[in-house]
Amino acid sequence: MNMKRVKLIVAYDGTNYCGWQVQINGITVEEVLNRTLSELCHEDIKVIGASRTDSGVHALGNVAVFDTESGIPGEKFSFALNQRLPEDIRIQESCQVADDFHPRYCDTIKTYEYKILNRRFDMPTERLYSTFVYYPLDVDKMKRAAAVLVGEHDFKSFCSSRSQVENTVRTITDITIDKVGDMIHIRISGNGFLYNMVRIIVGTLMKIGLGIWPEDCMESILEAKDRTKAGPKAEAKGLTLVEIKYL
């Protein structure tokens, strides 16, 4: 049989997973996909993911590829996998792609959304997919502060101190902040994100929204290139990888 490469669009509820990437500490999305594909194809399968989301982070449109000699057509893998995967992982789409397609080494725009429930008490139905903030957030201040981040900047202040990456320059193409009822939606798109970058941006915006920090502090935080100058890292559960668009 000839080897082929198949692309998957993967959605998952990250609540019960220790992130995407295989690790010894607990079950991960990548591990479940590897095991399920290996059983389906009767061969050893290892997927390559576009975004290695953290423990507790969700996804609507992560991308993964794998190579297989299976006779199953590329577009049929979504149905076949969804019959076997746990209910908190679903394949939105599958297709055969060029043998040299790599989900991490292409020009992309990634879009993340962070949800904040801003009201007097939490809601059980939202607790796994948003972070709860009791005190009122000033969304207009948050919008004005976020606008400073659009464009190409050195985001070292918004990168986890544990990260070993040398180049911390990234481009944010768009940030929108909308409040629908009691839920605040922060949507951020860009050509790549540093480790914990979105969650640190959100934590900083929450400080501004609460009036703890002035709304004009973003420029000085960027210029500092110092993680300690930005806000805390927001909880993982409020973050969802919405889409990865290949350019």
Which residues are covered by each model-predicted region?
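Structured-RNA-binding interfaces characteristic of tRNA pseudouridine synthases
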Residues: 1-247
